[in-house]
């Protein structure tokens, strides 16, 4: 005796049709203008910065050693930020090579005193006058990599400044360093081709007493297969006390023998 049975594909087609309709509706909604959502509640007043805590430098990638990313200044605020005008512009002459895997300018500069320190996609370092934007010195590094050429920032260290000791109970004290060196103030950069370089923050010259003539080979001891883009260093070095902490970027799905990620301090 024949008995009609619902084809197995019918429910699947129905679910598929509903899914497609939902996707079309979501795509359509992306292009519909939405009303501005305003914050509710009372607007908080602007609180003046305590003159004793007024910040004068941005000497770490994230502003301070703790990476707070917020600056204790109130000269520019929500009431006057719309009136800002460009004071100066500086061109490094180091060209990018397009988006994607090429050279890109992704740098966050540092400001220490009246100097601004910045780096180019090929790790050339510049010191500029903060008021005029004029070049004070240039340290040529000219790093090269097959892909992912970028310098996201530099690190600054002044051995003549008093060290900030940790306040956490049981923490290891920060070890003091010599102050009578060739470079009492230094700027550090790490490159995509695996180098950590130190230059004199006052002159831009290599610090010969660091590593080998101012350079540490970050590929040493990592084994084979470390050529960029397998192993690269693009993020700014981190100054932790008197140590320079360096990370790494490992490419995905390039080979079966990829190098391991490594974090080191010098």
Q: What residues fall within each predicted segment?
A:
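Membrane-embedded alpha-helical segments of integral membrane proteins
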Residues: 1-3
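Internal/C-terminal transmembrane anchor helices
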Residues: 5-33
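Short, acidic, Ser/Thr-enriched surface-loop or helix-capping motifs
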Residues: 81, 111, 129-130, 191, ...
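An acidic- and aromatic-residue-enriched active-site/binding cleft used to recognize and process polar
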Residues: 121-123, 130, 140-141, 192-193, ...
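Aromatic-anchored glycine-rich loop motif in surface-exposed flexible loops
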Residues: 127-128, 135
């Amino acid at each position: 005796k024949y008995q009609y049975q619902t084809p197995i594909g019918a429910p699947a087609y129905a679910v598929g049709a509903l899914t497609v309709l939902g996707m079309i509706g979501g795509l359509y909604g992306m292009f519909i203008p939405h009303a501005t959502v305003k914050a509710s509640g009372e607007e908080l007043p602007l609180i003046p910065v305590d003159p004793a805590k007024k910040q004068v430098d941005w000497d770490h990638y994230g502003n301070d050693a703790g990476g707070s990313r917020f600056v204790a200044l109130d000269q520019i605020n929500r009431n006057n930020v719309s009136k800002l005008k460009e004071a100066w512009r500086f061109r490094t002459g180091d060209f990018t090579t397009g988006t994607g895997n090429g050279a890109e300018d992704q740098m966050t500069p540092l400001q220490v005193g009246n100097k601004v320190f910045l780096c180019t996609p090929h790790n050339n370092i510049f010191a500029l006058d903060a008021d005029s934007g004029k070049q004070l010195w240039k340290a040529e590094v000219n790093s090269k990599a097959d892909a992912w050429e970028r310098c996201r920032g530099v690190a600054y260290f002044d051995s003549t400044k008093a060290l900030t000791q940790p306040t956490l109970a049981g923490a290891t004290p920060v070890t003091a360093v010599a102050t009578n060196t060739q470079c009492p103030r230094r700027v550090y950069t790490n490159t995509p081709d695996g180098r950590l370089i130190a230059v004199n923050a006052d002159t831009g010259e290599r610090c010969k007493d660091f590593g080998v003539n101012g350079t540490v080979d970050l590929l040493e001891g990592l084994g084979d297969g470390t050529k960029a883009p397998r192993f690269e260093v693009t993020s700014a070095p981190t100054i932790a006390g008197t140590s320079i902490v360096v990370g790494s970027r490992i490419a995905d799905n390039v080979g079966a023998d990829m190098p391991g990620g490594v974090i080191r301090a010098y």
